[in-house]
Amino acid sequence: MNLITDIIIAVAGVGVGVAAGYVIRKNIAEAAIGSAEAQAKKIIDEATKAAEAKKREAVLEAKEEILKMKNEVEREHRERRQELQRLERRLLSKEETLDRKIESFERKEEQLAKKEQEIENLRQSLEETLQKELAELERISGLSTEEARELLLKQVEEEVQQEMALLIKEIETKAKEEAEKRAREIITLAIQRCAADHAAETTVTVVALPNDEMKGRIIGREGRNIRTFESLTGVDLIIDDTPEAVILSGFDPIRREIARRALEKLIQDGRIHPARIEEMVERATKEVEQDIREAGEQAAFEVNVHGLHPEIIKLLGRLKFRTSYGQNILKHSIEVAHLAGLMAAELGADVALAKRAGLLHDIGKAVDHEVEGSHVEIGVELAKKYREHPEVLHAIATHHGDEEPKTVEAVLVQAADAISAARPGARRETLEAYLKRLEKLEGIANEFEGVEKSYAIQAGRELRILVKPEKIDDLASVRLAREIAKKIEEEVEYPGQIKVTVIRETRAVDYAK
């Protein structure tokens, strides 16, 4: 019973406690809500006041900005209005000026029309007067208008030709002076730095004997030794009354050299019979081939030309045994290479190319007696075969003037070839060829109309021409000299240059009686 009572009391106590707690909490919550509402109201009031202040400031700023923009717009408007007023005034001024100019042009146009009419009237008057004068001139002179025009044109043409001849002479004189001066300087420098000797042309070789008894041993029994020797070498062995000497004769200098060496070895050995002759000729042939190769290599080394084909080097070596008008062709080629290289250096051209072309320019002469064609054509084919540079081919093809040189190096090779050939002592020609050249020079000059006589003097290096003064005047003599020189260049082969001098002499003779 007490337990139940205690439980009831406890439950009642808890209920009273809960009710009391609820009441207390409600009071506290209501007090807190009242305080929060007061605080919120205070914040709202402050925010409202701040917003009102910001609003007033924004309105003031907006009004100021609007006022500022309004003032700016009004200022721009005033400026534009003023600018438009200025433009309007300028436009009015230009319109007034244009009106005045139009009026002036109209007045000038009227004046021009009057002048044109006056000129037309004057032209018609002059035309009528001219026709009358022409008719009168035709009546007086007996010439028609066309005849008078032709006569006038002929006179003008003669005057122009005279002036042209004088101008050409003046230009040629100046050009020759400048060209000769520069060429003389270049050639002098090149020649001073290049020295070369020359060899005399010959078709025989003399071999000395220790005694005349050796002649019989060379001939052999019934001449078998001499027949064997000649058949193996292709050279004639001449044994005559010349004491202690025999003569080897042949146009091929390489064969002649092989024969000389073989014969000297046979003489030194003393054993001369067909088998020994064959052995010595074979040995001499190998020696000469070795000499040819060494001569070609030495020539290329001397002029500092590299990269030559071995066959080209052999062909160069063969030139050691060839001559032209007494001049050794290999030495001539080396000399041309040196001269072309020196002149190329002076002119700023390709020195290596000039030397290479100069060294190979006569390469065709190594086999021209074995292959058909000129040495120029053969040289071009050989150089092309062994893959030489196209400009080297061009220089070889043009060095005798068969083609027009198109490169500086080709011109230099042509000039160096002429210089080397014309050098005193470098070449000699047969009397027959010399006389034919002189006759050819005089014959060319005598072919021209107005030539009275011609003389080739100074060993064919100058041609003097006497003309008929009644047919050739002073200006025509200038043209005649140039035409004769051009024809000589086309038809005559000669070393160096030939001076063509035209002499016109007028004599007046009378007798006192």
From Swiss-Prot:
Keyword terms, alphabetized = Cell membrane, Endonuclease, Hydrolase, Membrane, Nuclease, RNA-binding, Transmembrane, Transmembrane helix
HD domain mapped to chain residues: 329-422
| GO CC field | plasma membrane
Q: Does the record carry Transcription as a key word?
A: no
Query: Where in or outside the cell is it found?
Result: Cell membrane
What are its E.C. numbers?
A: 3.1.-.-
What Gene Ontology terms for biological process does this UniProt record contain? mRNA catabolic process
Enzyme class (EC, first level)? hydrolase
A Pfam family reported for this protein in Swiss-Prot or TrEMBL = RNase_Y_N
Molecular function via GO:
RNA binding; RNA endonuclease activity
Q: How does it sit in the membrane?
A: Single-pass membrane protein
Domain KH: from-to ranges = 203-266
Transmembrane segments in this chain: where?
A: 4-24
Recorded hits in InterPro entries, A to Z, give: HD/PDEase_dom (IPR003607), HD_domain (IPR006674), HDIG_dom (IPR006675), KH_dom (IPR004087), KH_dom_type_1 (IPR004088), KH_dom_type_1_sf (IPR036612), Ribonuclease_Y (IPR017705), RNase_Y_N (IPR022711)
The record's section on SUPFAM superfamilies has: Eukaryotic type KH-domain (KH-domain type I), HD-domain/PDEase-like
Concerning Gene3D superfamilies, the annotation shows: Hypothetical protein af1432, K Homology domain, type 1
User: Which family would the database say this protein is a member of?
Assistant: Belongs to the RNase Y family.
Q: Check the record and name the NCBIfam families matching this protein.
A: HDIG, RNase_Y
Function of the molecule: Endoribonuclease that initiates mRNA decay.
- Name this protein carries in UniProt: Ribonuclease Y
